[in-house]
C-alpha cells in the first residue's frame, strides 16, 4: 500500500526501489557506474564534447545483457544504474552517461520510439524550463522523455547539479547534463528507438 500511495515501483514488501526512496537501501551506489571525468576537450565518437559524467567507445561501461544487441541504432536507458547508452547502426557505443530518472513508477520498461521533440519545453506545472526535450512515451500525467537538467523559470536556478546525476531526482523524465542533452538532441530524431530497462 505504501508503494501504491507514493507511486513507487511495486517490488515486494520492501524492495530496492521502495528502500531507496526511504533512504534505507544498503550499497545503493554499487548499482551506479561512475566513469572518470574525461580529459578537457574530450569528444565522443561523433566529435561532440563529453560532459563530466560521460564516456564513449571502449571507455564506456559495458552494455547490459538485455540491451537489444544486434538491433541497430537505439538509445538504452537502464533505470537501476541511472545510465544511458547511445548505440549507432554498427553497434558502437557512441556515448554513455549518467542521468537522473524518475523517483516514481512512471518510466515504462520496454521498447519505445521518439515521437516528439522540442528544443525548449515547459514542465507540467509550467514552472521549469526543459531544454532539448525528446519524448518517447506518455502516461496519464503527461509526456516522458529525456531533457537537460531543468531550471526554474523565475530564477534560472537549476533543479539539481551535474554532480547529482546518477540519483533518481525527477518527477518523470530523464535529466541529463547539458552537453549530453545536446548530444542526444542531435542523435535521436523522431522514430529513434528507445529501450527502457
Please give the residue ranges for each predicted region:
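Short acidic, glycine/serine/threonine-rich helix-capping segments at coil-helix boundaries
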Residues: 1-24, 31
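Generic anion/oxyanion-binding catalytic loop in active/binding sites
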Residues: 8, 73, 170
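Secondary-structure transition/capping residues
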Residues: 10, 29, 33, 191-195
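Exported/periplasmic cell-wall-interacting domains
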Residues: 13, 68-70, 107-111, 118-197
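Cell wall/extracellular polymer interaction/catalysis modules
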Residues: 18-120, 131-133
Amino acid at each position: 500500500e505504501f508503494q501504491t500511495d507514493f507511486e513507487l515501483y511495486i517490488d515486494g514488501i520492501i524492495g530496492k526501489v521502495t528502500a531507496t526512496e526511504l533512504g534505507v537501501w544498503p550499497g545503493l551506489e554499487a548499482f551506479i557506474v561512475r566513469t572518470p571525468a574525461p580529459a578537457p576537450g574530450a569528444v565522443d565518437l561523433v566529435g561532440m564534447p563529453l560532459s563530466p559524467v560521460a564516456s564513449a567507445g571502449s571507455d564506456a561501461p559495458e552494455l547490459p545483457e538485455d540491451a537489444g544487441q544486434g538491433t541497430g541504432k537505439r538509445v538504452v536507458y537502464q533505470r537501476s544504474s541511472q545510465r544511458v547508452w547511445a548505440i549507432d547502426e554498427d553497434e558502437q557505443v557512441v556515448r554513455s552517461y549518467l542521468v537522473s530518472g524518475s523517483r516514481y513508477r512512471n518510466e515504462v520498461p520496454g521498447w519505445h520510439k521518439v515521437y516528439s521533440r522540442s528544443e525548449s519545453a515547459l514542465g507540467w506545472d509550467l514552472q521549469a524550463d526543459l531544454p532539448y526535450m525528446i519524448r518517447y512515451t506518455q502516461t496519464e500525467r503527461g509526456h516522458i522523455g529525456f531533457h537537460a537538467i531543468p531550471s526554474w523559470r523565475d530564477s534560472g536556478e537549476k533543479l539539481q547539479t551535474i554532480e547529482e546525476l546518477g540519483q533518481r531526482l525527477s518527477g518523470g523524465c530523464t535529466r541529463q547534463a547539458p552537453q549530453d542533452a545536446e548530444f542526444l538532441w542531435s542523435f535521436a530524431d523522431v522514430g529513434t528507438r528507445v529501450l527502457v530497462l
